[in-house]
Amino acid sequence: MTSPKLPLLVLACALPLAACAATPEALKPYPAASSGYNRHVIELPAQADEAEHKVELIAGKTLEVDCNTQRLGGQWQEKTVEGWSYNYYELGQVGPAMSTLMACPDNSRKQAFVPVGGEPLLVRYNSKLPLVIYAPADVQVRYRIWSAAPDTSPAPQQ
């Protein structure tokens, strides 16, 4: 005999996942991914004060690297859906890896995530709209949530 608590537990676990999935209706204004690109959609949970948070978008590839610092070339663009004023982000073609040229010890090669270089892309935190990103199909898109410290510090006058 199945415990009546098990179906309730499964339902309780599944509901938050269903709520976080972007509905086709929410994505309708956004263009489909063009050939060779993938569309990535991030649904952010609601925060008490969303102005105190930012989302950092990080794109890159998992490559075989050595002890040198590696970066990929690429440029983010912020675009707007026509007629909707919804923003989305597009990463253009990602160039070859750039690297420092230090001598590395033998057997220092490993698989690691190599990000697209340049300034980090920090975007406004908004749980009411999906965060839509278009990137080349061979590129991974990751993100990180930044939160402001609750205290501020006065700037000294000079």
Residue ranges and their predicted role:
Residues A51-G118:
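Mature extracytoplasmic domains of secretory-pathway proteins
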